[in-house]
Every structure is written in structure tokens, then in C-alpha cells.
From Swiss-Prot:
GO terms for cellular component: cytosol. The gene is pnp. The keyword Transferase applies. It is found in: Cytoplasm. One of its GO terms (molecular function) is polyribonucleotide nucleotidyltransferase activity. It is an enzyme of class 2 (transferase). The keyword Cytoplasm applies. This is Polyribonucleotide nucleotidyltransferase. Residues 555-614 form the KH domain. SUPFAM superfamilies: Eukaryotic type KH-domain (KH-domain type I), Nucleic acid-binding proteins, Ribonuclease PH domain 2-like, Ribosomal protein S5 domain 2-like. It catalyses: RNA(n+1) + phosphate = RNA(n) + a ribonucleoside 5'-diphosphate.
Amino acid sequence: MFNKITKQIQFGRDTVTLETGQIARQATAAVMVRIGDTQVLVTVVGRKEANPGQNFFPLTVNYQEKTYATGRIPGGFLKREGRPSEKETLTCRLIDRPIRPLFPKGFMNEVQVVATVMSSDKNRDPDIAALIGTSAALSISGIPFSGPIGAARVGYKDGMYILNPSYSELAESALDLVVAGTEPAVLMVESEAQELSEDQMLGAVLFGHMEMQPLIQGIKEFAAEVGTETWDWKPAEQNETLKAAIKDKFAAALGEAYTITEKMARYAKVGELRDACVAEFATGEDGAPEADEVKDLFGKIEKSVVREAVVSGKPRIDGRALDAVRAIDCQVGTLAKTHGSALFTRGETQAIVTATLGGMRDAQFIDALEGSHQDHFMLQYNFPPYCVGETGFIGSPKRREIGHGRLARRGVEAVVPSVQDFPYTIRVVSEITESNGSSSMASVCGTSMALMDAGVPLTAPVAGIAMGLVKEEDGRYAVLSDILGDEDHLGDMDFKVAGTARGVTALQMDIKIEGITEEIMEKALNQANAGRLHILGEMNKAIAESRSEVSDNAPTLLTLKINPDKIRDVIGKGGATIRALTEETGCTIDIEDDGSVKIYGETREKADEAVRRVEEITAEAEVGAIYEGKVTRVVDFGAFVAIMPGTEGLLHISQIAEERVEKVTDYVNEGEIIKVKVLDVDQRGRIKLSMKEAKED
């Protein structure tokens, strides 16, 4: 019934098992990959024909984590998985980025990759298994694909690199780096680090690439055993005569257009030339080329003109040298009522970044496969259409926005204090108001300044820079600092580095071509370091270190410690006491099981009042102290007196007066306020009071 094929590959200390032929047989290809007790089903479906008029490659990647993978039932009313989580969205991008460049140019057939986590041992992140499964499924699908690729996660501890570290190992690691690539070349890097050097980061990339080689070889053997024939697909033949004619007519004008430094004016001029080209060659007559073909060839010539100018040593599009950073303007405190704000402008890229401080209850609840936890640091990135002069839909964040927000977060997270050292929930929002390349790195810079403006005690300022590469087949290449949007689009590499003056905190690399050597990566990292230090110097002119106090607009945080036995008194029956406290003082009160109390107030006065009330409720009677108390009950043998909220003591009849007391009500009555002295507190917390000794004192 099944033609099941299995392949086992030794991958470091793990065994990777690939299986096909039993599950999802109607898909173009399906592979179940297993590492330990983690199992991920990856399916690939490709259409044999492209849709008419298709002018882009419709690749879709979906990654989904099923709660049954860890033996849990989803929460919520519907009890089923909902829209993709941020983690799932980020993993979709992680899979998409290294495979997309390996499909041939001109391939417009729809391809969908679906990776489903069906079992998880909660020991390691399933994303590496999903990447491996995607590579294997594409390799046996027959779809044109220049793979396979391998993938590895790399940690770093005590001067040693760790291949595919577990969650517990990552918690103690100074690095979390994912690298993917083919046998000869690295294609993608995603990482966060604790201020490591450029050499340590490059070493991690090369270590991961070396360690994945057995995996790549194993997938090749697996594909050979499956034996699927590659599709008989050939790209459409290019009209070289037409291309030469367009080049002769428009190459020089395009070169002139790309000397216009202002983005919108340059786009307008290139648009005019494109329209003129279409009008001249796509005449609509019999035998004349279609407009789409003319536009495509015009775009190729445009790309070659810009690239040739770069590698031949001419000034860049905006007139800069290869290693020059655009003009920078930094401001803090730009928004009056926010807790912290910054305006960061670098050339035609601009971000307004805000930092908001909240209480512990404001933390984001994360329900993940490896377990639930609270996130006390959030960074959200918004890219509205107006930032590039366009109209468009504004709504929930797209994959790109989620990815850029996470990259910016990785860049600054290493310098943000722990929640134990700074017990606030922090939300940062980066609003991109102008964009012409490197907006995620502008978000890193703006975030660093906004947090310092809010009084968050960062260990060091952080800056980010995007690097680019143009590499021609003849070996000539140029590494570009602080790339423009056009340089990103027309170049061969997008290389983003964030860090402090001491080291790298985040690195993201996407390479569109093979043949990026260690020498090129080293040059890019060193050039990025110089650019980062320059940007930090410009940022320091606006704010060089965190303010000594949190913003006046931020909630005041006061902490105190109470006896854990008194927690129930603060909470009260059914939460009545703490509800009244929060409503009457306007403060948020968080109480830990160990008696730690955190009070967040809109003003210092409100927070002080809440502290006073809590101390009043939790105060313990001090032997020898005199209190004014209210008589709550009168009995034959004395009276009960409330000396503090929730605290009563017994005033025995013998302690009311010096003379013999026959009748208690001759001296005290219910509701009366009297002075009493605490004589003793026994082991059970019972308090003995004296009225006569209070009078003597």
C-alpha cells in the first residue's frame, strides 16, 4: 500500500530521520522529519503551469504549531488553533528566506510549502526540523530548485560553539544564531547575541555552515533514492535583439537618472523613461513585443546600469562613497506626554519611536509549545503606506512588519535590564514615517534613544546599520554601508548588524547569490562596525546614557515587603480589600507569594497613599507601643480593641484602671476611641492590651 522510503542522517549529536511515501501522498512532495521526539510534516505543492500574465514568483510558506504536539488542548471558546502566532510568522519567514533565491529566475509557477509541527519534545525549537524538512521535500518534488539546503542553530558558551543547543543550553548561551545554506554557500543568517565580536559572529556562521554539510549530503542521497524526475521547465527565451535596442536607447539616460539623489524625483524620472520605452517598443502592432516584456527588459538594464556604476568605483546613487553613512539627525523627548520618545532620521529614512512603561500585569502572555510565559519587553514596528509616498491598507501587521519588529528587538534586548532589576513592562513602538532603506535599523537606533529618554537603565546604547553587496561574475565586488532601498533591491546581499560599542547584539543576513566568500563577509562585518560606531557617536549627541529617573509621565513604582501571612489581609474576602485600595488610590498593586508588593501609581502622591494604606493593613503590633484604638466589643471580662485595620487585641478587665473594675461599661463602651499599650503578643498572634499603663506613659 505504501512505498515508504526512510533516510537517517547523523547531525552532530542528533539523528535526523526523513520519511516519505506514507503520509500526504497527494501532495507534490511530503516529508516527515524527526529529531528526537520532535516530528514535523512538511508538504510541498507546485502547479505545473503558471497563471496567465503572472509576473512574480508566488511562493507561500506556512508554518503551524499544533497544541496536540505537546499533549495540550487549545484555550479559548473554540478550542482550536487560531491565526498564526508571532513565533509561527517568524518561522515562516525563516523558511522562506533561504529557499526563495534557489528557484530559477523566470519561474512563475505557484508553490506552497506547509510545515506542521505534529510532535514536540519541548527540548529544542522545531524551526530547524521544519527547515530541514522543507529542503528535503523540495529536493524530492521535481520542482526546479537549486538545493538542497541545510540549516543549523549555533550557541556559544565558554569560548565554544554549540551545535543545535537545547532550550536550557540557549538560556546560558551568549548567542542564538540560525544559519542556512547550500553546500558551497551561506544563504541566510538570523541571530541575537550578548555583545560578541565580529570574529566570534563570523566564526559561528562558518561553524554552522561546516556542521550542516552531512545534512546536505544526506538529503541529496535521500532525493536520489526517491528518484523523482525534475520538471521539464525552461525559462522563456529572452529577446536579445530587443534588449540591445532598449540598452542603446535608454542606458545612458538611466545612468543620468540614477545621479538624482532625491528618491521621489529619481523614481519620477525613471518612471518617465520606462513609459517612454514602453511607448517606443510596445506599439501594439503585429509582431511588436508586449508591454510586460519591454518593462521586464527595461528593469534588467536598469539593474545592470546601477550595478556597473557601483563596482566600477563611481559614486553611489546619492553621491556617497561605499563606506559612507547618510546624514543623521537625532532628537529625544519629541512627544510631550509619552514616557520616552525619539525621532531618528538617517537620510530619507525616519522613525518616531516611543517607549511606554507599565506594571507587571501589562506583560504579554505567550502560550508556546515549550510552555507559557509572560513577556515584559515588547517591540512593535509599523510601516504605514505614506512612509513611501503610497496609499494602501492600514490594519493588522503583515509578516514583514512582524519580522522587522523582532529584528529590532533582538538588537536591543541584550542591553535591556531584566524584570527583576527593573520591574516594569516595557512596550516600544516604532512608527516608520519615511523609508528609503534600513528602516529596521533606524528602529534599533530610535528604540535605544527612546528607552534612555524614558529612564530605562540600558547597559549601553545600541545602533544598527544595513550593509549591501554588489558582486559581478568577473569577480569584482563592492560592499556598501547604509544601503538605500534601490541598493537593497538591485544588490546581492542584505546584511543588517546591530550592536553597542563593545560588540554585536543582532545579525541578519540574506544572500541572493552563491559565491559569498569568508573574505566578503569579514569585510562587510568590519565595515559595519565602523559605520555602527559613527552612528553611535551621532546618537550620543542627543542622549548618551539613560536618564537617572523614569519619566514624570511614567507610573511611579514603589516596593515594599510584607509578612506573607498578611497577604490575605491586603487581598481581603473575595478580593474586596485590594479592589477598594486600587479604586480609591488609582494604583495598580501586584503582590508576590513571598510578600513582595509593587505599587504603580499615576503620581507619587497616589503611590505614597497606597503604600500607607498597605502598611496600615499589614502593620504588626509592637510590644510596648501605644495605639489609639476603637472598642469593637465589650464582654464581661474586658473589651476587644481594634488598634489597626484587621488587628484586634484584648483589653482585660484587670488592665482597664488601677482600681478594681466591677463593670466594664463604666469605663469603656463600644465605638469609643481609647489609648492602649501593647503588653504582649503570643505565638498565636493574640495581643494583650493595657489601658492603665497607657495612661501612666
